[in-house]
Amino acid sequence: MKRYTGLLAALTLTAGMALQAQTNEFVIQTKKLGAEIQPTMYGLFFEDINYAADGGLYAELVKNRSFEFPQHLMGWKTFGNVTLQDDGPFERNPHYVRLADPGHPHKHTGLDNEGIFGIGVKAGEEYRFSVWARLPQGGTSEKIRIELVDTKSMGEHHAFATETLTVDSKEWKKYQVILKPGITDPKSTLRIFLASKGTVDLEHVSLFPVDTWKGHENGLRKDLAQALADIKPGVFRFPGGCIVEGTDLATRYDWKKSVGPVENR
């Protein structure tokens, strides 16, 4: 009995010493002042409501680019043989679309994206289209066609910027191409369709202006960000407002999920 009592005492002492070793000190030097804060200093805070981020400060032009909205095809209109899949390459964003031959020589398979209140583009500016894609059935290559479409031209859908991408791998890979529209259209549509007879999977579809604020790829809309910078705020709070708490604990703003490769955020 004495042996067990001694062992217990030794363990208790060891645990106490371990806890004591983890003690940290925080020293406040009350007589050493830091930078003086002016009572007239003003600042900004960013609350992600009313399209302040997507459709606002963030320069992405595609709505629901990873098919992860609660309604997975919100913002998209499909035509032909399009199916939604849920075993994609990105853990946090597993949904993607599969484009297959429509089975008719005069029909196409594809999808249109409406953007957020339309996809606004300017004549002569460059826009980077990118997509993760693969050939699920193997093969050497398949082609997809990318178009910016004016849906208001005399009741017809007129494509005013077009490019073709060749998907050449059965593994997921990022592809990109530059679109340069010849006209200015504040409410165009992005159209993507299969331009060959096989099957292609598409994930994380993006259309981004090349000319962003300070030239950052995947960056901020140049005019809005510069307008905020010109205010010269003393502080910038992010996240700001009540949206930080979400509607419940599961939907709270978790910054750890907003870093890393953009396709897996």
Segments (PLM) and residue ranges:
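Bacterial N-terminal signal peptides that target proteins for export
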Residues: 1-8
